Amino acid sequence: MREATVYLLRIPGAGELPLSRRERERKAVESIIREVFGPEAALHHDDNGAPYLDGTATGTFISVSHSASTACVAVRNGSAVGVDIETGRSQLRSVAARFLSPDEQAIFTSDTALLTAWTSKEAAFKAASEPRLVISDIRLSSDMTSAATPSGQRFALFHHPIGDSSMITIAIPYA
């Protein structure tokens, strides 16, 4: 079964909550965690930076992402999940060679395709949780419905556009 639950929360602007952007993002994620798992749940990060929760059932996996305006937490029971949310920006075109293989660069040329490829690789990277994995080594299928790591892990990818310029991608391991 390939199920995950994704929670979104708008991040307050600096005028609404006078903290640094990073602090507003952190507070938004903590708010989601408290709402979903209760006040006893505590978010931590392992040595590789992957998030995990104390105070929840064993086997609960989470992934965290945020854009400038939205915090996102994906939750899955039983196996890993990866999530990424991004707002499209022109910089993706200038850094495409850093995250796409030459073959992928030839296929994914539009701004929307670059945004989808970026979020796909980020989500798969998070779900893989492999030490020393390099994002450019993750390979995407030409239709961006799956991703694979050099070690053989494979992921189903699910894309959800948000508004005109943002994308959420969820990566779930194939059984």
Q: What do these predicted regions represent?
A:
Residues 1-175:
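Core catalytic alpha/beta fold that binds nucleotide/phospho-ligands
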